[in-house]
Amino acid sequence: MEPLTEREREVLRLLMEGALNRDIARRLVLSINTVKRHVYNICGKLGVQSRTQAIVKARSLNLL
């Protein structure tokens, strides 16, 4: 598995807290499209199809 970048880990951490894309964008001072791209990359690196699956897989792998 390709490692997550620091920013991807930040986004994943916020996803695990239940934050929406707009909340993540606001907190990290990013555009919503950039957040969506990070979520897409996270899912690809974890080999999953959804943000919920990404959270479950990240927890099972103790990524955060």
Predicted regions and their residues:
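Helix-turn-helix DNA-binding segment
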Residues: M1-Y40, S60-L63
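Basic, Lys/Arg-enriched C-terminal extension of HTH/homeodomain DNA-binding domains
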Residues: G44-L64
